[in-house]
Amino acid sequence: AADKAATEMARQGVALAAGDPDKRLEHLLRASDEMRATFLTMEARLVEWVGLFLPEVRFGKDRSSLPKLVGEADSLATLADKLSVSMPDNGPSKSEWKTLREWGESTATFRGKLDRLENAIRELSESHLPSLSIMLGPLLAARLCVEAHGRMRLARLPAGTVQVLGAEKAFFNHLKTGAAPPKHGHIFMHPWISRSPRWVRGKIARTIAAKASIAAKVDAFEGEPWSQSMVDEIDQKIESIK
């Protein structure tokens, strides 16, 4: 009887966890981080590999089209033509090209999986964290929620803590060595901070953290979700700081 009761309690616990948006966001976000790390490794390998045979290619920051181009090319000559570069004197063997092409296909497939995973995060975040999502974007909102271990815990954090969520290593280094304390954590990812002059980032981070803390409370206590006009007001305030 005790075993049966324990099994039933465990089953109910799993069922409750499956219905918990905080837990679901955590799994989605961790999976996304792991998948992105793998994708970036695969993409970097592909860029180096193609560059070995086609040294004239200059990818710059935009590499997004390369995996698909490689995967669809039936030969190195076809790829060189698509990239508008000349063919080298020494090219890969048929088996080597096949392997390179398959790597391109796999990288493109991985990119598609990552996009679908991030779309799932956006969808859940916009439902679970509507005000924070419209303010910071659903991916950053989800990251702050997961870092705080849940929507309610995020809502209860002071703005100063929200400001440095994700900068724990830098904060502990500050305590240990006396180095300068971090001015921001994950919220640095938002263009409001990352695209602002360095000397005003701390002030902007404090403003954003204060507003994000309020948005988190609205979401946690299921108040009226913020509108775009409210976000526009924040944007105007930040512009006045710069």
Residue ranges and their predicted role:
Residues 204-242:
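Acidic, carboxylate-rich catalytic segments that either coordinate divalent cations
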Residues 122, 126, 130-162:
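Basic (Lys/Arg-enriched) interaction patch that binds polyanionic ligands
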Residues 1-61, 74:
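Phosphate- and other anionic-substrate recognition elements at nucleic-acid/protein interfaces
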Residues 146-220:
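Phosphate-backbone recognition surface of nucleic-acid-processing proteins
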Residues 74-88:
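Long, charge-rich alpha-helical interaction segments
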Residues 33, 37-40, 44, 71-74, ...:
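Generic structural signal for well-ordered, non-transmembrane alpha-helical segments
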Residues 24-34, 38, 92-95, 99-102, ...:
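Non-transmembrane, amphipathic alpha-helical segments
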Residues 85-139:
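Helix-hairpin-helix/helix-loop-helix acidic hairpins
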